[in-house]
């Protein structure tokens, strides 16, 4: 005798709550997303679909965004969203380049690290763009010339790079070496050997850290030009399953990262890694950034990523759903390549997909009294 199927009461509070979660909890449960095309709407056309996977972002102190794309060709673009601007301008399509690993804003120039050549990933640079007078009344940009610094290390792919403001240089890694690029001299210098894996980050003191095997971080101090291998021990977790990613809190320099299982941690040079802060709904953890009140926003999961928020004041990780923009035109966001914090605390995500957009996320404003702690608890 077959077992009788259990009947569900679709009018029960439990069933209604589940239906509500499925219906209204799949997409953007908190805050507002705006998907912005890679153009000046109404005045120019976006970067073509198979060249517009946004994989690298950075921002100047004034809040001007620079980015790089991957695909059939790599492009470098500038984006402005404050004042009377509201546009993305394609600065250059780089012939031969198919992958942009990083863009780094210096005091006067932006450097892009691009791959696609047999002799190794190269660095190209151009002057920063000034804030235009008024993009409503008049709009005039010229595509600037780019200078090619050459390969970062001959025969090796560039993995990632970050700006080092104190010396106005760029520190990066290839598949086997640590290097610096100096805009003042247009020179690239090899600083040592490191395993080229995942992304690197700048700490509160200005040191650069990156993954050193599956159990440690290496550390490079630009001021003393000293490289320490196996400088910091990683906490318990799965650190070889997904590329290492970071988010940096601008005010304190506190870093956030995640292991391959979606476990979140913070890192402070003096105190080491925190205890586990929480776990994301999906894995692996993708790009993330920290807004001004200390909350961390990012994406997790492959192909159909969901947004998450870690709130240090509440000490919890929440699932915010799949990215959806409903302002002016409807667009769903599934895969993202990088993230950066904007001038006013909004988070800007680069969509790593055909016809990629810049997604501006405006977090929910906290209620009065919902303060933020100075630092998350750390293991001493």
Summary of predicted features, one role per range:
Residues 22-50, 143-147:
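A short helix->beta-strand "capping" segment at the edge of beta-propeller domains
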Residues 37, 87-93, 134-150, 189-193, ...:
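Beta-propeller fold detector
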Residues 43-74:
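Beta-strand-rich domains and repeat architectures in extracellular enzymes and scaffolds
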Residues 51-57, 96-104, 148, 154-162, ...:
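Repeated scaffold domains used in trafficking and secretory/extracellular systems
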Residues 65-67, 110-113, 169-172, 207-210, ...:
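Conserved beta-propeller blade signature
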Residues 72-74, 116-120, 215-216, 262-263, ...:
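Short glycine/acidic-enriched loop and turn motifs that connect beta-strands
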Residues 80-84, 128-131, 182-186, 221-225, ...:
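Short loop/turn segments that connect beta-strands within beta-propeller blades
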Residues 332-380:
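Blade-level signature of beta-propeller repeat domains, shared across WD40, Kelch, NHL, RCC1
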